[in-house]
A protein has these predicted regions:
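A short SAM/SAH-binding and catalytic strip from SAM-dependent methyltransferases
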Residues: 1-28, 72-76, 80, 86-95
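A mobile, often basic/glycine-rich helix-loop segment
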Residues: 8-59, 110-119, 228
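Long, Lys/Arg- and hydrophobic-enriched amphipathic alpha-helices
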Residues: 55-229
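Residues in flexible loops and secondary-structure boundaries
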Residues: 5, 23-32, 39, 44, ...
Length: 229
């Protein structure tokens, strides 16, 4: 990012989920952190005390308590990133699209094993050391954290919605009128429609991906993508 952004829109799509995370486990009123160690047979998990007090503060500021044995991820890099964005942006918007939830849902009992997954050639696994350096490691985004840390640097929450509702609201205002083109074949137009469908259906990306919009230096705008359906 430049040192100063006088006016603009900072847009990201699947940026935050690719940032490194801390893996922690609830231990009564305390936390334990999972480190990467080196054992007799290669890389392995090592459970020790948290590496930073910021991990405890992260949950405290969101009023989140992990159950005994509950695993979770903490993306401190995302906290630093949104704080930096807020400090450098003087007027404009921050649009963050990614898969994840707000804290209340992200850290509920449906996610007792956390959300960290490894991807390689369309294969999903929780064996993070199987092909070290060759797998993509991703964890769900905590949008509550982005909201709270953004506020600390002047970003105001404009709105939060699912990708499905966001795109359908935009479509209602004619923003995808050129989705079909007379210059394309019927097969190409069909492919476009199918690709758009994957972005809005619950079975595709529609409800998995969320959209967080924040603004700074301007009145709260009435954005088409945030209008109720």
């Amino acid at each position: 990012l430049p040192d100063r952004i006088t006016c603009g829109c900072i847009f990201s799509n699947e940026l935050i989920d690719a940032m490194p995370v801390h893996r922690v486990t609830g231990d009564g009123n305390h936390l334990r952190e999972t480190y990467v160690g080196l054992g007799m047979h290669g890389l392995c998990d090592e459970i020790r005390s948290p590496s930073s007090a910021a991990l405890r503060e992260y949950f405290a500021e969101q009023n989140v308590h992990l159950e005994e044995g509950q695993q979770a991820e903490v993306n401190l890099s995302a906290c630093r990133w949104i704080e930096e964005v807020g400090k450098k942006l003087e007027r404009g918007f921050v649009v963050t699209i990614d898969y994840g939830h707000e804290a209340e849902e992200l850290y509920d009992q449906r996610h007792m094993r956390g959300t960290l997954l490894a991807y390689q050639r369309h294969r999903v696994t929780e064996d993070f050391f199987r092909a070290a350096g060759e797998q993509d490691l991703t964890a769900h985004v905590n949008f509550t954290s982005l909201d709270l840390r953004g506020r600390q640097s002047g970003l105001i929450r404009t709105g939060f919605t699912s990708q499905s509702k966001f795109l359908l609201a935009l479509a209602r205002h004619g923003n995808f009128a050129d989705l079909q083109s007379d210059e394309l074949s019927e097969a190409e137009n069909m492919q476009r429609r199918l690709l758009f469908k994957t972005l809005i259906t619950p079975e595709g990306m529609g409800e998995t991906f969320q959209v967080l919009i924040q603004h700074k230096g301007t009145r709260r705008p009435d954005l088409a993508g945030l209008q109720p359906l």
